[in-house]
Curated annotation (Swiss-Prot):
Annotated CDD domains: RNA_pol_B_RPB2
Descriptive protein name: DNA-directed RNA polymerase II subunit RPB2
Family the UniProt entry places it in: Belongs to the RNA polymerase beta chain family.
One example GO MF annotation: RNA binding
SUPFAM superfamilies according to UniProt: beta and beta-prime subunits of DNA dependent RNA-polymerase
Renumbered residue ranges of the record's region Disordered: 1-20
Species of origin: Candida glabrata (strain ATCC 2001 / BCRC 20586 / JCM 3761 / NBRC 0622 / NRRL Y-65 / CBS 138)
Renumbered zinc finger spans (C4-type): 1162-1184
Note: The binding of ribonucleoside triphosphate to the RNA polymerase II transcribing complex probably involves a two-step mechanism. The initial binding seems to occur at the entry (E) site and involves a magnesium ion coordinated by three conserved aspartate residues of the two largest RNA Pol II subunits.
GO cellular component labels: mitochondrion; pericentric heterochromatin; RNA polymerase II, core complex
């Protein structure tokens, strides 16, 4: 070690000399930093997509790899006796880097920023090795065909080569993306923000995220009780899904008939494609297990368990009639869907169902009947244990029994469907060419659009499935990435969704379950109908991508697992059942040692670390899961320490030192000889371990490293030395822990990790802030100036908060903050801050407090109609253009675009465009000889104004001219704008006072904000006050205040520090009235608090209308601010007016101010059939030959419309006036 390194170690505060010392709370943060440095915050998206591209794609193609078409000899002539067999096989798949094909045929690399600006799709080409072979055989009657491959010389007969089959959208920062290995300077050149984390797709220029979809795991047996009226008391069910491949699901239910009271309680099973429930004994016999004794042995593993055997008696009697396999198969086959077939066919049908559809996850090959029989027995065993009340029913909401489908599985499912469709089309083309005796052309056979547009459609619309079946497919799987604030983007990438109907009133799936601890954020979930169904991952939780179970199964067989085929239950009653991914593979006599070995292998890295192993000692089961979609999180491993004679963390000071050395080297290019010691090193040395929800139930976790130390009682520390104010008390289990939390604050997700002291708030307040933090303005990315987003808000002077949390470091909240530290007084002053409004200092606003930029982009392109007609960007002239808009066209240049820097206001035209009119169109009679074009320009939104910031002219994929215009506005805080602290304390500005009207302290400090004291007590946001206190200390001392949750920081401690700086320890100050200068008669809580400006601004909401546009159909005012609509006088308002008795006002609102209409009615027939010539004052109802008895009435136009619609339905509403009644 060189000298300068030694210095580095000497001045180190951690005391690294003691390599083996236990780590402190501070050291755990070094471990967390290592985790995020390696994993990042969206690793679950990237890993899943990489797995898909690297492995799943090839699996899907290999699964459907060969198409065979046989053309039998036609025997039209003597010589025509040759049968041919055509075979197309798909080989390896290749994925290029992202490319774009321009309209002029040039192909070049496509970088993400260009894709965003030009509305392209960031996607790679897929190429597959396709081999076409032709075989021939001479067809001799009475003999099987013997195909020979035709001689290879003639190249036509055997073609092979890479063939383009479609385009795959690429996830940003995945292995196939250009940004995956770009350095910071590369990113700068590509105009990408180094903070952008990837994990999303770019489809037609818009950024799309795939939301993780939650589902119940397949291949697990679950037992449920049925409610009273049902004839079935208990049911055991399993949803078998094949390990990889078609996600084809087949459900098996084993039902216990009869309630508790009834005598004969039989057990029957529901088989797929069989109409009736089949008694289980018959299924066993169909599987080839004939004697009653053997059947019972498959179900009941203990011969002396008379209760269970008693319950099985009626079942044995139920199947007594059928005593051999043939009859049993026939019994099942008879109840199949196909009717009227012969016995052999029926038996074959039943065999096929038992082989392919019955428990397909065990195997779909034949000859494994005994394994399926044992599994069926196991299901019945579980059912009976529940029925005998020895075991509770299963919990549907247990998070370990759930799986999250991320980008990988979702795309796999879609790609499989599309690839099937493609192969079908190729097969059809083969048939056509063979029938018409044409040449087979690979380019024509493969329609690459199938896959390209299929994937693009699903990602663009979020309807996951084929276009034709849009109704049946899931909606909202792909969403537009939220780019409001950096943290809202991060949070969106870590969101999960449960596809249950939102209107379901079921509370259970929405509740926070114990098993969510550490995996799902307890605070961050929306309010309202999606509450608890949309969740967000905790900071350190990851999702498994799936590992191959084969090595583990092989290992088990070598390590003394007896295969299921040889299992005889009464010989080894204590054997433990071994399951891998829900398949029962065998039994083991020494599970403790086996578990020890498996754990050791996983901690060494010989078994994939994301595999989970659970030994359920009570149930005598050992379950191993390697499948994709399990949520897991890292924990420290605790083991016995020989020297200390107690449990101790395996991670030591020395390891932390190495981690920090590596980090130091990364950041400052420190000493080179330090080995790279990363998170993976910790994993492979068995210091940390991944635990999922299922395995978590078999371990005991300490909350902090301190919990492992012997408690005060054991050490006989005198009572007075025990700190009673310490927030986190020590527990007494120090002997049995197996793991330890890395840090308890890691149970929170992205949005909740920004809240200071969330452990001091009432829980719904944290939920409110988690939702509001996503609407705060800040800097969403550093390259916002190069982006043309539809909308963007940028805060002028964002600040990092004075009260920070440790997790903010990983959320880059200091680099890209979303708020400012305002000086806040909590006081009643002038009464303009009642009901969650607040008083803001106008002078601070003038100096730039909470000012923000607002960008909006407008987009247009020259569309093509048919071959000849194309729109053009130009400045429309009134002389030759029809239907021009009201706004001014003067600001356009001759090319139809506006120059940057021009000030624009509502309805000004910013993109001029015309469409040629076909010569034969009339255009509703407005057209004259000169008019050759129609206006198709884009005006600025009527309610906005600003300055043109940037204009981009380019071409889109079809080579058409395409333009984006970005308009910039400055938004200054004003009365009605919404702000919030980080504790769900939201409010609007009630009034702004200039500095001289605000109260001031003895030091002459004036607050920026005054909030009302009534906002605090009922909401119990104590953290708001503690944050203020801490920020005050931070501002005085010049350090950041640490407001992380679950630490030892107390109000007591902060108060002490504040006192040392010479302030009142609880943050109170004497203030003076700004109007009179008199001392205020109360001490006022005063200090800095971090406030966020939210996106709801009064200028975007203010709306009024006198007269304006009407709907065409009902002639009532249109709806909505953007269309200058009216304000609806609704049903409830109507009821109030009736209650007030204000009838004339009611009529005025609902008729005169809306859609009053004059009609003439005939006094005889009461219909609106009168022909009125008003200028001649002539009226006539032709049907009644009536010219005199005619009345003019005023009714709402909507009523007139209703009457006419009723007439169209042959219902005649007749209108009579009082006078016409008298006639």
């Amino acid at each position: 070690m060189s000298a300068d390194n030694e210095d580095y170690y000497d001045e180190d505060p951690y005391g690294f000399e003691e390599e083996n010392a236990p780590i402190t709370a501070e050291d755990t943060w070094a471990v967390i930093s290592a985790f995020f440095r390696e994993k990042g915050l969206v690793s679950q998206q990237l890993d899943s997509f990489n797995q898909f591209v690297d492995y799943t794609l090839q699996d899907i193609i290999s699964e459907d790899s060969t198409l065979i078409l046989e053309q039998l000899a036609q025997h039209t002539t003597e010589q025509d006796n040759i049968s041919r067999k055509y075979e197309i096989s798909f080989g390896k798949i290749y994925v290029t880097k992202p490319m774009v094909n321009e309209s002029d045929g040039v192909t070049h690399a496509l970088y993400p920023q260009e894709a965003r600006l030009r509305n392209l799709t960031y996607s790679s080409g897929l190429f597959v090795d396709v081999t076409k072979r032709t075989y021939e055989a001479v067809d001799v009657p009475g003999r099987d065909l013997n195909y020979q491959l035709i001689a290879e010389e003639s190249e036509e007969d055997s073609e092979s080569g890479k063939v383009f089959i479609g385009r795959l959208p690429i996830m940003l920062r995945s292995k196939n993306c250009y940004l995956s290995d770009a350095t910071e300077s590369d990113l700068y050149k590509l105009k990408e923000c180094p903070f952008d984390m990837g994990g999303y797709f770019i489809i037609n220029g818009s950024e799309k995220v795939l939301i993780a979809q939650e589902r119940s795991a397949g291949n697990i047996v679950q037992v449920f009780k049925k409610a009273a009226p049902s004839p079935i008391s208990h049911v055991a069910e399993i949803r078998s899904a094949l390990e990889k491949g078609s996600r084809f699901i087949s459900t098996l239910q084993v039902k216990l008939y009869g309630r508790e009271s009834s005598s004969a309680r039989t057990i029957k099973a529901t088989l797929p494609y069989i109409k009736q429930d089949i008694p289980i004994v018959i299924i066993f016999r169909a599987l080839g297990i004939i004697p009653d004794g053997e059947i019972l042995e498959h179900i009941c593993y203990d011969v002396n368990d008379w209760q269970m055997l008693e319950m099985l008696k009626p079942c044995v009697e139920d199947g007594f009639v059928i005593q051999d396999r043939e009859t049993a198969l026939d019994f099942i086959g008879r109840r199949g869907t196909a009717l009227g077939i012969k016995k052999e066919k029926r038996i074959q049908y039943a065999k096929d169902i038992l082989q392919k559809e019955f428990l397909p996850h065990i195997t779909q090959l034949e000859g494994f009947e005994s394994r399926k029989a044992f599994f069926l027995g196991y299901m019945i065993n579980r059912l009976l244990l529940c029925a005998l009340d020895r075991k509770d029913q299963d919990d549907r909401d247990h998070f370990g029994k759930k799986r999250l489908d991320l980008a990988g599985p979702l795309l796999a499912q879609l790609f499989k469907t599309l690839f099937r469709k493609l192969t079908k089309d190729i097969f059809r083309y083969m048939q056509r060419t063979v029938e018409e005796a044409n040449d087979f052309n690979m380019k024509l056979a493969i329609n690459a659009k199938t896959i390209t547009s299929g994937l693009k459609y699903a990602l663009a619309t979020g309807n996951w499935g084929e276009q034709k079946k849009a109704m049946s497919s899931r909606a909202g799987v792909s969403q537009v990435l939220n780019r409001y604030t950096y943290s809202s983007t991060l949070s969106h990438l870590r969101r999960t969704n449960t596809p249950i109907g939102r209107d379901g009133k079921l509370a259970k799936p929405r509740q926070l379950h114990n098993t969510h601890w550490g995996l799902v954020c307890p605070a961050e979930t929306p309010e309202g109908q999606a509450c608890g169904l949309v969740k967000n991952l905790s900071l350190m939780s990851c999702i498994s991508v799936g590992a191959d179970p084969m090595p583990i199964i092989t290992f088990l067989s070598e390590w003394g697992m007896e295969p299921l085929e040889d299992y005889v239950p009464h010989q080894s009653p204590d054997a433990t059942r071994v399951f891998v991914n829900g398949v029962w593979h065998g039994v083991h006599r020494n599970p403790a040692r086996l578990m020890e070995t498996l754990r050791t292998l996983r901690r060494k890295g010989d078994i994939n670390p994301e595999v989970s192993m659970i030994r359920d000692i009570r149930e005598q089961e050992l379950k191993i899961f390697t499948d994709a979609g399990r949520v897991y999180r890292p924990l420290f491993i605790v083991e016995d320490d020989e020297e200390l004679g107690r449990k101790e963390l395996k991670v030591r000071k020395g390891h932390v030192a190495k981690l920090m050395a590596t980090e130091y080297q990364d950041i400052e290019g420190g000493f080179e000889d330090a080995e790279d010691y990363t998170w993976s090193s910790l994993l492979n040395e068995g210091l940390v371990e991944y635990i999922d929800a299922e395995e978590e139930e078999s371990i005991l976790i300490a909350m902090q490293p301190e919990d492992l130390e012997p408690t005060a009682v054991e050490q006989d520390i005198p009572k007075e030395n025990v700190d009673l104010a310490k927030r986190i008390k020590v527990t007494h289990h120090a002997t049995t822990f197996t793991h330890c939390e890395i840090h308890p604050s890691m149970i929170l997700g992205v949005a909740a990790s920004i809240i200071p002291f969330p452990d001091h708030n009432q829980s719904p307040r944290n939920t409110y802030q988690s939702a509001m933090g996503k609407q705060a303005m800040g800097v969403f990315l550093t390259n916002y100036n190069f982006r043309m987003d539809t909308m963007a808000n940028i805060l002028y002077y964002p600040q990092k908060p004075l009260g920070t949390t440790r997790a903010m470091e990983y959320l880059k909240f200091r680099e890209l903050p979303a708020g400012q530290n305002a000086i806040v007084a909590i006081a009643c002053y002038s009464g303009y801050n009642q009901e969650d409004s607040m008083i803001m200092n106008q002078s601070s606003i003038d100096r730039g407090l909470f000012r923000s930029l607002f960008f909006r982009s407008y987009m247009d392109q020259e569309k093509k109609y048919g071959m000849s007609i194309t729109e053009t960007f130009e400045k429309p002239q009134r002389t030759n253009t029809l239907r021009m808009k009201h706004g001014t066209y003067d600001k356009l240049d001759e090319d139809g675009l506006i120059a940057p820097g021009v000030r624009v206001s509502g309805e000004d035209i910013i993109i001029g465009k015309t469409t040629p009119i076909a010569p034969d169109e009339e255009e509703l009679g407005q057209r004259t000889a000169y008019h050759s074009k129609r206006d198709a320009s884009t005006p600025l939104r009527s309610t906005e104004n600003g300055i043109v910031d940037q204009v981009l002219i380019t071409t889109n994929q079809d080579g058409l001219k395409f333009v984006k215009v970005r308009v910039r506005t400055t938004k200054v805080p004003q009365i009605g704008d919404k702000f919030a602290s980080r504790h769900g304390q939201k409010g609007t500005i009630g009034i702004t006072y200039r500095r001289e009207d605000m109260p001031f302290t003895a030091e002459g400090i004036v607050p920026d904000l005054i909030i009302n004291p009534h906002a605090i007590p009922s909401r119990m946001t104590v953290a708001h006050l503690i944050e203020c206190l801490l920020s005050k200390v931070a501002a005085l001392s010049g350090n950041e205040g640490d407001a992380s949750p679950f630490t030892d920081i107390t109000v007591e401690g902060i108060s002490k520090l504040l006192r040392e700086h010479g302030y009142q320890s609880r943050g109170f100050e004497v203030m003076y009235n700004g109007h009179t200068g008199k001392k205020l008669m109360a001490q006022i809580f005063f200090g800095p608090t971090y406030y966020q400006r939210l996106r709801h601004m009064v200028d975007d909401k203010i709306h009024a209308r006198a007269r304006g546009p009407m709907q065409v159909l009902t002639r009532q005012p249109v709806e909505g601010r953007s269309r200058d609509g009216g304000l609806r006088f609704g049903e409830m308002e109507r009821d109030c007016m009736i209650a007030h008795g204000a009838a004339a006002f009611l009529k005025e609102r609902l008729m005169e101010a809306s859609d009053a209409f004059r009609v003439h009615i005939c006094g005889i027939c009461g219909l609106m059939s009168v022909i009125a010539k008003l200028n001649h004052n002539q009226f006539e109802c032709k049907g009644c030959d009536n010219k005199i008895d005619i009345y003019q009435i005023h009714i709402p136009y909507a009523a007139k419309l209703l009457f006419q619609e009723l007439m169209a339905m042959n219902i005649t509403p007749r209108l009579y006036t009082d006078r016409s009644r008298d006639f």
